[in-house]
Amino acid sequence: MNATGAGYPLASLYIGDLHPDVTEAMLYEKFSPAGPIMSIRVCRDIATRRSLSYAYINFQQPADAERALDTMNFEVIKGRPIRIMWSQRDPGLRKSGVGNVFIKNLDESIDNKALYDTFSAFGNILSCKVVCDEHGSRGYGFVHFETHEAANRAIQTMNGMLLNDRKVFVGHFKSRRERELEYGAKVMEFTNVYIKNFGEDMDDKRLREIFSAFGNTLSVKVMMDDSGRSRGFGFVNYGNHEEAQKAVSEMNGKEVNGRMIYVGRAQKRIERQSELKRKFEQIKQERINRYQGVNLYVKNLDDGIDDDRLRKEFLPYGTITSAKVMTEGGHSKGFGFVCFSSPEEATKAVTEMNGRIVSTKPLYVALAQRKEERKAILTNQYMQRLATMRAMPGPLLGSFQQPANYFLSAMPQPPNRTFYSPNPVAPVRPAPQWASHQSRPPQYQPPTPLMRAVQPRRMSSNISTMKQASTQVPRVAQHSQRVANIGTQTAGARAQVNPSMMRTMPHYKYSCGVRNVQPIVSSTHLQQVMEPAVLMQGQEPLTASLLAGAPPQEQKQMLGERIYPVIHEMHPTLAGKITGMLLEIDNSELLHMLESPESLHSKVEEAVAVLQAHQAKENAQKSAQPSLI
């Protein structure tokens, strides 16, 4: 299978039938041996954040994705065999039905893997699935071949064959609309007639005598109960459609045994249920349209208000067709409905009565809404609030921590060494990826280490002694902005510094206890600003500029290649899982952790604690299982 063709421009796989507890870290550990992975995403419900039981994995190389598809399909994760197929981003290809085969009358023992193994001999399979419910297989499935020719070969060979001693039907997949059109054409040519309401005094012989007058009857059957008595309905099958149609036209509504019988086309149970459902929905929609804009919902009613009092209060605003106070056990539930004859009258009643005090309680009056409408409105409001909360900037982390002593030296030193400040200039919550393209406010600075060029020291008498005079934080916001601008941003390009600005910019030293900031006279000028780099043995230095310049799909891979060896030294057996968990963190924070071993070690220990707690929970469940049996 050519994964690099026009059908599959990306090396992306769809992973289906996942256990709800499967996470990205588990999938990373499972699929990373196949090759470098750019991204993994488990799709979740937008409201509940529960897994939808499928995921997407993007490999760097199509060959790695194809290897995973060939070798890992139907492997078991958390007790469930997974189903892997190419991610088809074109919905037209998925919905066209070209190469899609339908199989029915399958034995219950046939699962996805058995069906795949049976039909893979006819060509490349894009998707294979046996439809199941909570009780197991439903006896049918689908196989989607890459080409129409492969599907034809499978149909010609397998249709009517025995699979596990059951004769299966194999044919081209047809959409519901196509099936309904075909079935509708067959229905118009019916030969089987259904008769009901003829009572208990009827048998096959007498029913044949009555209906044989309209044509040749192939079979006649009166349905009986366990005692041998008629259940009041039966079937008559004619040789052709014209005879059956004549029997329906002549006998429907006639009297037999003193009863008016019903005669019509025989229907399958699912067809009858669909027709009844369609009629019910039609009646429901007519009722909704009839009361649209004229039915009012009234709540906060006093317990003493009944139907007559409710009608009396709203009568001045128009003709009322119905007024009802909802009760339970003879007691008012505090709300009711008033229906007017026209929308104009209902609108006037809402305007006049909403908020009016009736029997010491203010009424709430509004147009009545169906439960589905209210649920949709509430869901929409909730999602809007959720989106607003996500779009709002988060609170600053560590905003109550006083920074350590920052100062820029005035001593001449060579520009070939880099010094890193012990704390970031502006510790903030790392921005999520979905907000990475939004403009930042002017006062925002990414969490980047403050650095300066380090030169050979010599004594300088112009550095004054700092006093711990007060615990009040000095007002140095303007200078903090300048100092922060000297550092390089982790998500931006290499910082550009204007030499003239560097010469005129005053240098300060800070202390948590001083009220005023003392300027330091610099005898030399900073010639350049060095960018922090993460050095790993055998790999090129990783800087913020280098990371930002890489394509988004490669940034996680670059960080993972540098994080994994460090984690492997601390926890060799859990390195894969922990790496996958940490790669979900924002890139800027990952880069900061690589620069700060203490931060990385802390995050690793947190991940280990989470994994150990999860493992302990699973062990407890396993140990408790035998006692439940």
From Swiss-Prot:
Please give the Gene Ontology molecular function terms for this protein: eukaryotic initiation factor 4G binding; mRNA 3'-UTR binding; poly(A) binding; poly(U) RNA binding
Acyltransferase recorded as keyword: no
* Matches recorded under SMART domains: PolyA (SM00517), RRM (SM00360), RRM_1 (SM00361)
Disulfide-bonded cysteine pairs: these are none
What residue stretches are annotated with the RRM domain? 11-89, 99-175, 191-268, 294-370
**Gene Ontology biological-process entries:** chordate embryonic development; mRNA processing; mRNA stabilization; negative regulation of nuclear-transcribed mRNA poly(A) tail shortening; translation
User: Mind telling me what this protein is named?
Assistant: Embryonic polyadenylate-binding protein A
Lineage summary: Eukaryota, Metazoa, Chordata, Craniata, Vertebrata
